[in-house]
Amino acid sequence: MDMKKLIERINFLYKKSKEEVLTEEEKIEQQKLRREYIDIIKGNVKVQLEGVEKIPTPNRKN
């Protein structure tokens, strides 16, 4: 599922949960979608951090 559709579905289930009680299937789906979203974000952050290079700083005397 692409990120836009994932977020739309998460938001839909959240709004629905505020208006009425979610079924057990919907609660399970909501948990899975949230976990998938978090895993995608973690993966993106990891890739970005792996691409970061440390820039050496010159030794300074104060």
Swiss-Prot record:
It holds the Pfam family DUF896. Belongs to the UPF0291 family. GO terms for cellular component: cytoplasm. HAMAP family: UPF0291 (MF_01103). Keywords: Cytoplasm. PANTHER family: UPF0291 PROTEIN CBO2609/CLC_2481, UPF0291 PROTEIN YNZC. This is UPF0291 protein CLJ_B2839. It is found in: Cytoplasm. It comes from Clostridium botulinum (strain 657 / Type Ba4). The lineage of its organism: Bacteria, Bacillati, Bacillota, Clostridia, Eubacteriales. It comes from the Bacteria.
